[in-house]
């Protein structure tokens, strides 16, 4: 079988929205080549547990590669992808070079190409993310999240995911109810359950993401605590929860802050990331305007996570 490798040279800011577009278009895998991973300083506790090859990375910017089966619909799919990516400019997202290339690859080349980009990575004091095919022996007090990266993978875990997991690790004490808005692969829902949350609801508008998350939830044996379903943000969600975590675009976070306040218990915690540094204050302003108290702001590379409390106790 032949595959088409769709590659786009863009910016780190555009990585998550572009990857989402590629997933929704039916990509069988997404590779993220970010040269910042070569010089990433995780400190003593966190980091990639393998050696990266500098030859695999662009000199600047980020290269995103997605793989699609060659069929009669490919041309139409590519045009829809281009249109959706250009539409990100309406959200003030810097696309950088925005240079797109298409190359045909054979099945065996594709099978080898993507696995080299996904290795175990320690993302917090207690959690390490491991691809399903890797043999990895957990150390004492180390929790493993196994992921099948069939839908998305890169050279390491995205900074916003790392920030959210570290925030969950600090917030969850045991027995909390959690909502994960825009769950994607389900990694944050799984992390919340493994850290001790008793009830987790993962929400995503994308049907493919929901299926991927459900599979990863079963893989990690947290299906008793975690339910994943298709939903647009917090629309129609009833009841209140202890924690809401959302790793999505700043503009989207701003749009549903009021809904998050309504769904959070008094004194509940709202963890948000997916925020590029230059949009940090916009999100903070929206949170404060809606009655949240900013507890902490954490930065990693060009990204920000904000931990806020529902102020009306």
Swiss-Prot record:
The entry's keywords: Cytoplasm, Methyltransferase, S-adenosyl-L-methionine, Transferase
The protein's matches in Gene3D superfamilies, at most eight in alphabetical order, are given as: Vaccinia Virus protein VP39 (3.40.50.150)
Cross-referenced InterPro entries, in alphabetical order? Ribosomal_L11_MeTrfase_PrmA, Ribosomal_PrmA_MeTrfase, SAM-dependent_MTases_sf
**Per the record, a Pfam family?**
PrmA
> Which CDD domains does the annotation name?
AdoMet_MTases (cd02440)
Q: Which GO terms describe its biological process?
A: methylation
| Reaction it catalyzes | L-lysyl-[protein] + 3 S-adenosyl-L-methionine = N(6),N(6),N(6)-trimethyl-L-lysyl-[protein] + 3 S-adenosyl-L-homocysteine + 3 H(+)
Q: What does this protein do?
A: Methylates ribosomal protein L11.
Which PANTHER family does the annotation name? ELECTRON TRANSFER FLAVOPROTEIN BETA SUBUNIT LYSINE METHYLTRANSFERASE
Recorded hits in NCBIfam families, A to Z, give: prmA
Family membership noted in the UniProt record: Belongs to the methyltransferase superfamily. PrmA family.
Query: What is the protein's name according to its record?
Result: Ribosomal protein L11 methyltransferase
Q: Which organism is it from?
A: Halalkalibacterium halodurans (strain ATCC BAA-125 / DSM 18197 / FERM 7344 / JCM 9153 / C-125) (Bacillus halodurans)
Q: Which gene encodes it?
A: prmA
């Amino acid at each position: 079988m032949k595959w088409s490798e769709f590659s786009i040279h863009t910016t780190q800011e555009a990585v998550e929205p572009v990857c989402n577009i590629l997933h929704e278009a039916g990509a069988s895998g997404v590779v993220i080549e970010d040269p910042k991973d070569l010089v990433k300083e995780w400190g003593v506790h966190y980091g990639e547990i393998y050696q990266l090859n500098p030859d695999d990375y662009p000199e600047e910017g980020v290269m995103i590669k997605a793989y699609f089966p060659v069929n009669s619909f490919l041309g139409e799919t590519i045009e829809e992808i281009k249109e959706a990516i250009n539409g990100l400019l309406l959200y003030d997202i810097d696309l950088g070079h925005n240079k797109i290339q298409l190359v045909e690859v054979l099945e065996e080349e594709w099978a080898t190409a993507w696995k080299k980009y996904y290795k175990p990575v320690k993302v917090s004091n207690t959690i390490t993310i491991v691809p399903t095919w890797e043999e990895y022996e957990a150390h004492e007090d180390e929790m493993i999240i196994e992921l099948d990266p069939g839908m998305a993978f890169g050279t390491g875990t995205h900074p916003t995911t790392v920030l959210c997991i570290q925030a969950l690790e600090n917030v969850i004490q045991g027995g909390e109810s959690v909502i994960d808005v825009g769950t994607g692969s389900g990694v944050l829902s799984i992390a919340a359950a493994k850290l001790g949350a008793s009830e987790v609801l993962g929400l995503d508008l994308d049907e493919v993401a929901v299926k991927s998350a459900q599979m990863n939830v079963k893989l990690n044996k947290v299906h008793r605590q975690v339910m994943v379903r298709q939903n647009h943000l917090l629309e129609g969600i009833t009841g209140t929860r202890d924690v809401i975590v959302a790793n999505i675009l700043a503009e989207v976070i701003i749009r549903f802050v009021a809904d998050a306040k309504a769904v959070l218990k008094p004194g509940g915690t709202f963890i948000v990331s997916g925020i590029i540094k230059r949009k940090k204050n916009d999100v903070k302003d929206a949170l404060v305007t809606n009655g949240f108290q900013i507890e902490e702001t954490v930065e990693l590379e060009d990204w920000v996570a904000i931990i806020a409390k529902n102020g009306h106790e």
